[in-house]
Amino acid sequence: MKPPIILINYKAYENSYGEKGVEISKKIEKVSKDYGVPIIISVPATMIYKLSQILEIPVYAQHVDALRHGAHTGAILPEMIKDAGAKGSLLNHSERKIRLDEIHEAVTRIRDLGLESVVCADSYELVHPLALLKPNAILIEPPELIGSGRAVSKEKPEVITRAVNEIKKVEGVYLIAGAGITTGEDVYKAIELGADGIGVASAVMKSSTPEKIVEDFIINALKAIDRKK
């Protein structure tokens, strides 16, 4: 994982699985290769194996359970996603929150398996304590802006700048900004404010031309990073 980080959460949209899931993933990977920017896709558990077999970009799970092998019906263990080909997992998304002790256990297990973790935080106050668990990145997402089309980088830029100040207290953990990211301008602003990348879902998954959206994101991310040099 290295900046600019672009993480696309497929959630459970109609085009997140099956042949539609394969189709959108291939489009995303093509743009990723065209610009030399690895894009992380966080996909439904049922798609991890299929997509990891045909793609070179990192495939993540959307969630894992902090449980050991045993009688846990319906559980998704870190070992399971590794076996399926995942390179990492999202954790603690606003739509799939878990307790702090569960986050700690999951991050540790994921790291021990040689995988990556991105832990979501719904406020900048949580960035530092979550970063102390040493995931690869923290994804800051004010829940009220998720899926709203109103970008955190425009609506609440102070959330990003404060999160940046918190992440600097812990070495080796990236900060990703998400919630409402819709345009390349939103991406540029987020990185200008100090984020290492962006997280996005509906802007890509609901688009009729997802490859154009992703290309716009990459162009502006690279432009923002170049401007900061």
Curated annotation (Swiss-Prot):
Protein's job: Involved in the gluconeogenesis. Catalyzes stereospecifically the conversion of dihydroxyacetone phosphate (DHAP) to D-glyceraldehyde-3-phosphate (G3P).
Native organism: Sulfurisphaera tokodaii (strain DSM 16993 / JCM 10545 / NBRC 100140 / 7)
Record's subcellular location: Cytoplasm
Catalytic reaction list: D-glyceraldehyde 3-phosphate = dihydroxyacetone phosphate
Protein family membership: Belongs to the triosephosphate isomerase family.
Pathway involvement of the protein, from the record: Carbohydrate biosynthesis; gluconeogenesis; Carbohydrate degradation; glycolysis; D-glyceraldehyde 3-phosphate from glycerone phosphate: step 1/1
UniProt-annotated catalytic positions: H93, E141
Keyword hit for Cytoplasm: yes
GO annotations of cellular component type: cytosol
Self-association and partners: Homotetramer; dimer of dimers.
Keywords: Cytoplasm, Gluconeogenesis, Glycolysis, Isomerase
InterPro entries: Aldolase_TIM, TIM_sf, Triosephosphate_isomerase, Triosephosphate_isomerase_arc
UniProt record, GO biological process: gluconeogenesis; glyceraldehyde-3-phosphate biosynthetic process; glycerol catabolic process; glycolytic process
Gene this chain is encoded by: tpiA
Positions that bind substrate: N9, Y10, K11, I146, G180, A201, S202
Protein name, entry field: Triosephosphate isomerase
EC number: 5.3.1.1
Molecular-function GO terms, alphabetical: triose-phosphate isomerase activity
